[in-house]
């Protein structure tokens, strides 16, 4: 199969040949393919290393459709293709078939086109008016493998650009086999430049566009400045013989660029290694929102939908009369400057461009408005003031000027809005002999006010007294100009017209010649009503304006309504639709699946409420599917709604949770997906008396937890001027117009720094000096040496004494200290040192070992000798009995003191509680009075706050008015943008610091609480002081914080028990006094909640309350909407720079409605002072219990004497046995029952009813 060519002329390959036409050419088959991640290019020439970069430009969207064009045999696919915003062009080749392109609009000689071709020896680029061939192509002879013809255009003229590369040699022979080369190009025509990017990748494919990622690099930036709407490829035709032609196999693919945001990933070498199309899907947008390729599990707020206006609405009044400016400028005679005249211009169309473009005026200066924008504006009225001055005085006709003319003749206000036009009239108002008809005032008592006119001609005297010239110090106030045609230009006459514009405080009567458009309602549009410009949705309003009212403002002073100047219809202005979107993800490490929450939108309205047709393509996500779940928070798409409840992995809000689970729990598959469900505390049947299962610890282990809590952060300040402007003087001067913003920022930072110091003081002020910790200087990477005590200091006694003595400390009721001083180290003086206390003889309840030995020896001796001393030996038992009695007395009086102290504590505590309650009542009364006053002013204060906060909106209106009227110097515009952007950055930084400071403040408060509850006490809260049940805690200072070392015991083993909050028995409910009821499978027990210690349920550990009826109530079912922040008032700050602008009409309203009542709570304060006094009197005066310390250990001679005494007693006992009748009982020879029998004591114990348990 071949292609036949008609009228073919063979010439050398180096020449452009005459066009020819193909016969029997078949239309190519167009196929659709996916672009995968093709088409990414370097957006600029800036080196970036190891960073993520967001850029918005024309890109080929990822996984978009590209159209494939194929050439083989007589299928020659190079049609004219639309260019649109730009194209992605990829060619899969093996024989260099694609050789170039033609870009243009009409693609003929009626307009310029640009040709980019590879002619096998050079790359040639030309921009001309071409007579293009119908089928532009290169011809190659198959047998020779050489190029023979170049048939691209017949003629070229009006060439404005040409480029020829260095010479090279291209292999143009036909190849067989698979496609080996993938050449990618991106073309975009922007700002008069044609940008060309190129990439190459070796391939081995049979068909289709291979998937993959390859970054294209810039090769051309062509300054062509031509309109490009179409293009076509230039291919190669292969000729097996003369006059017979065919094509080789090749394919190219075309995709269209769109304005899209891409996130590019640069490696350390500045190479783009990965990219994200932010508009591809919700996950891609989420990655761009958080600027990360890896997303953790959670729900994330992404960008709002940004609606693009669908059109422009321009509405001006129905005025057709032209303004009579000619009557003003072409008047035959002008008045003198002191008697200037004014003409009111209204109800007409003003074409200011005629004045602006005229070369007739030597001076044309506008103030407060740009001359080039006058035709776009409307005014209530325009006033034209006219007069004549000399050339040198024209400069005084301006705001803020001084001089004879400005002070005594014609004065403009400082906030003047209008234009000054002046032109030389020497040919009209000057003569060769002098024209003295024009006068000016040169003397006056006091300066004129703006637009004040004084036409009097009363003689002037410095003292103000009447006089008649030519008397001394008496002058006529007017002087003649005397215009001569021969004088210099500074003394020549100039006619002046001052146009003053009255802003729209009334219906517009003077407008520019701008044509009105149709009114578009219920769509996002750019509007211009009498010069009021903005963007919003226009809807019919129910408001009723007064005839003179043109605009309406809300409570925040934002323009929210307008009168249509053509129809007088009242229209409401609302912002274009913005819909909040959240993305739920299980984390990119788990899955790329996401769900999308369209906030506050019904699922039935998702496609319309967000105005998908008006969304900008640069940043857009929209998801639909079968898994649609309507929630109170909005429409959730992409998550499967299930009734089963899981652990709440991702809280969405409004009672909805999401998790990533295996769906096999619901169906017989192993696929995982995002499931959404309604959070629940249990089924409806799970009422108070239902059985539930709890885990109770049965064994524990000691755990040490380190907890770091920040209480401060690094102090920062900002060199605002250097940060924003660097060394630029111009920027610094412009920054002055922003007032004290920088000072306020640093003031906020200083406040944060002071708060950090306060946090630190408050936390560490609770660390007591008496607190001791073990010698542990380093633990867990933290240094504990700052709070650890020094090594133990030596005690009062020496080491040897501590070795020989034991120390015992007792509570002293008041007699033990005297006893110790009396006793000294002589234990034998025990009874002698007995003390008197409240009429009783007392001894300390303390017996040392040597005292016990002495009294025991006396007792045994008295008992043993009683038989043979006829009872006299029993007297030795008296010391034992006396000291026992005295010691019981000592114990008794000590217990009595303790009891009395406890009684005093209870009484005084109860008294203090009553005083505290009374103080709380008094405080509540005082606060009630305060609340009443505050409530009375609430509405007025709310109104005032809204009016004050609305100033920022009014400022925006002022700026919009100024921007719509003024032309700025480009340099100042750029500097102002820089300042605004960096000020916003600084404000964001300070806001972040304030948020962080709030977090630090909360952390410091929590640290102070833990210092009190964990360090200075033992917390009963589980997991509050470490993990588990708290034992003790140690604090340690750390950088910007405090470290707690919590010692806890944590459950190591647990058992599950069935439990119930109460047990119903015989119609009554029994509740545990402490602990919980558990069921072990056979019986119910009561046990502690934190440790399994079952006890039998008795009336001692339960109490009865109420009946078995269950009352179920909802404590709180309130869902709070997010608060809308009020804008801060910058009125005082900006009044310095924006004064007397009438268009925004900033009005703080009538604040006289505030009730300025004085709160009188003096009685309550006096009562609080009295209560405080009573509380001070509640100090508990306890009887002092001193501490008595005694070191006890028998010395060696006591032991020796004790042993000797025992030996003597034994010997005496043996002697007695030998001397009495009991001697023979030892051998059993006689009865000695009365001597050797042991009596059995069957008496009851003294303490009856007391059972002793030994464990």
UniProtKB/Swiss-Prot annotation:
Organism: Severe acute respiratory syndrome coronavirus (SARS-CoV)
Outcome reported for the amino acid change (mutating residue 501 to Y): In strain: Isolate GD01
Residue intervals of the BetaCoV S1-NTD domain: 14-290
Motif (KxHxx): 1251-1255
Membrane association type: Single-pass type I membrane protein
Gene3D superfamilies named among the record's database cross-references: 1.20.5.300, 3.30.70.1840, Single helix bin, Spike glycoprotein, N-terminal domain
Gene Ontology CC: host cell endoplasmic reticulum-Golgi intermediate compartment membrane; host cell plasma membrane; membrane; viral envelope; virion membrane
Consequence when changing residue 227 to K: In strain: Isolate SZ3
Resulting phenotype, residue 999 to G: In strain: Isolate Shanghai LY
Region Receptor-binding motif, annotated ranges: 424-494
UniProt PTM comment: The cytoplasmic Cys-rich domain is palmitoylated. Spike glycoprotein is digested by cathepsin CTSL within endosomes.
Membrane-spanning residues: 1196-1216
Receptor-binding domain (RBD) as annotated region, ranges: 306-527
Ranges of residues in domain BetaCoV S1-CTD: 321-513
Descriptive protein name: Spike glycoprotein
Carbohydrate-modified residues: 29, 65, 73, 109, 118-119, 158, 227, 269, 318, 330, 357, 589, 602, 691, 699, 783, 1056, 1080, 1116, 1140, 1155, 1176
Resulting phenotype, residue 437 to D: In strain: Isolate Shanghai LY
PROSITE patterns the record matches: BCOV_S1_CTD, BCOV_S1_NTD, COV_S2_HR1, COV_S2_HR2
Position of the signal peptide: 1-13
InterPro entries in alphabetical order: bCoV_S1_N, BETA_CORONA_SPIKE, S2_sf_CoV, Spike_N_sf, Spike_S1_N_SARS-CoV-like, Spike_S1_RBD_bCoV, Spike_S1_RBD_SARS-CoV, Spike_S1_RBD_sf_bCoV
Site (Cleavage): 667-668, 797-798
Sequence similarity: Belongs to the betacoronaviruses spike protein family.
Region annotation (Fusion peptide 1) ranges: 798-819
